[in-house]
Amino acid sequence: SYVFRNSQHAADRFGLADAGNIYGRLTNSTQDVFEKRIAALEGGVAALATASGAAAITYTIQALAQAGDHIVAQKTIYGGSYNLLAHTLTQFGVNTTFVDAHDLAQVEAAIQPNTKAVYLETLGNPNSDIPDIDAIAAIAHKHGLPLVIDNTFGTPYLIRPIEHGADIVVHSATKFIGGHGTTLGGIIVDSGNFDWKASGRYPNIAAPNPSYHGVSFADAAGPAAFVTYIRAILLRDTGATISPFNAFLLLQGTETLSLRIE
């Protein structure tokens, strides 16, 4: 926990009226610096660091899809992500259609009335195939859906998916961002560009949320609504929190990212 000046200060923090540390499971000062640096590198408005890349991906899908919902995903993705979508999340009522991301007609045809996101990787793992991000972003947005991209292999040094239409970018920071094999971590970057209210598909983010004092995250956090929702609800309840020391180690890796990618 953190020290508050008085009860009003605490109430403002918990009510999202005043930005800052609330509770150690949600954020810490070292984590905050790491989040801001990766958000800046990706061109996003905010970010949320997690204990692993798998946690970042899982939280992202859980924030978008609930029981009865559907995801469209590139079929050539990291095996852990494939298993999450193909097997684990189906136990919670979220189903995925895997598509050839190079066949734009197939991508669009896979979208259903209950689809909540399109999911890609900038460089597919392990094939290193590169989808047409701009074209798929246009398809997703045409249907009122956010485009989620795993940029672990691409890194923001080589490509910034938000500039090509991605709405949410995720990383396993364990890989190129960390770079030294010393620590685990993940991160979710919010572009701030997706209109959660206009879409009408995401009441957990856009409407008053009964799990958080009736706050609408779209109203309270504005462009950073997506990662704020995950921090306040999913991280609070399930706790895949990055430790301050792991955030420090990932900051050290970020310092040399460009040199190592070169």
Region roles according to the model:
Residues N6-T58, G80-T88:
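Conserved N-terminal alpha-helix of the aminotransferase class I/II PLP-enzyme fold
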Residues A47-E262:
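Conserved PLP-enzyme active-site core in the AAT-like
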Residues Y2-F4:
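Short polar catalytic/cofactor-binding loops
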